[in-house]
């Protein structure tokens, strides 16, 4: 081992620099977003972990699907998927949700809480492997568009759910879908939003302005079409009080308009982003 001699003044200077750096960043915190596939995202902050839409039935050849290796790790509770606290389902469309897969996952991971719309529960109840005992570990949101936000608390996780119409509204089949926008705060620290397949029209978001203003969102995960329109971008930054957005639900063939937008988005399984949380000193 080589020993390097340094003067006392250098040591003091180094310590001084470290101290000032520590002070300048003492109110910066970090969480991480891990892209699973399509609209599926894993969020971790310390020991707290949540997933959004992790087990879709199919991508229908249009959207990327959750890799089989990731599914195996989820079921085993290994790797990135060890210690998951809660799973949030945005809506009961097959490119976001599989009743059979979620039932299997809940049976394999008995400590996980599921947050889902009523329509997802209805589909699970029709599955041959449904067991009513699972419902005790579920938080079901059943609301109409325009209803006030509902608050859900799971340990160190505080979430709200707001029903925002599915893209394609007001077509009846789209309007009937319970599409949930979740705002989730982990450990009273990092706050994220997942939007499912929300329709990008301001009229859906304006009635909830007070709700959005209550909490600054560090990172939102909107469907990519919010990032390719001026109205969608305005909704995120000005209506929803979002600091940063990362697009999801990106097709296998990435739209050129998204490539040209300069916006950040997830398109490959395993991509990660740091979620920077900046809070003012108290």
Regions found by a protein language model. Give the residues of each.
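Binuclear metal-ion centers of metallo-dependent hydrolases, dominated by the metallo-beta-lactamase
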Residues: 128-155, 234-282
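Pre-active-site segment of Zn-dependent metallo-hydrolases
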Residues: 48-88, 100-102, 199-215
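Active-site-proximal loop/helix segments of hydrolase catalytic cores
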Residues: 165-239
């Amino acid at each position: 081992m080589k020993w390097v001699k340094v003067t006392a003044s250098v040591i003091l200077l180094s310590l001084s620099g470290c101290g000032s750096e520590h002070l300048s960043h003492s109110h910066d915190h970090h969480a991480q977003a891990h892209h699973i596939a399509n609209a599926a995202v894993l969020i971790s902050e310390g020991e707290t972990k949540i997933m959004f839409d992790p087990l879709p039935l199919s991508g229908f050849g249009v959207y990327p699907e959750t890799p089989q290796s990731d599914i195996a790790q989820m079921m085993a509770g290994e790797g990135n998927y060890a210690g998951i606290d809660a799973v949030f389902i945005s809506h009961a469309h097959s490119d976001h949700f599989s009743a059979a897969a979620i039932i299997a996952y809940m049976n394999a991971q008995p400590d996980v809480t599921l947050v889902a719309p009523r329509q997802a529960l209805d589909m699970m109840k029709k599955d041959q492997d449904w067991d009513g005992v699972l419902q005790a570990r579920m938080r079901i949101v059943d609301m109409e568009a325009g209803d006030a936000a509902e608050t859900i608390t799971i340990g160190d996780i505080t979430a709200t759910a707001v029903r925002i119409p599915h893209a394609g509204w007001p077509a009846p089949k789209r309007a009937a879908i319970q599409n949930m926008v979740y705002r989730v705060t982990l450990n009273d620290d990092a706050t994220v939003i997942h939007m499912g397949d929300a329709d990008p029209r301001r009229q859906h978001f304006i009635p909830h302005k007070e709700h959005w203003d209550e909490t600054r969102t560090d990172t939102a995960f909107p469907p990519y079409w919010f990032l390719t329109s001026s109205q969608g971008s305005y909704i995120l930054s000005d209506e929803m009080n979002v600091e940063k957005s990362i697009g999801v639900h990106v097709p296998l063939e990435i739209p050129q308009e998204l490539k040209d937008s300069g916006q950040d988005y997830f398109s490959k399984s395993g991509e990660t982003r740091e979620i920077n949380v900046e809070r003012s000193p108290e």
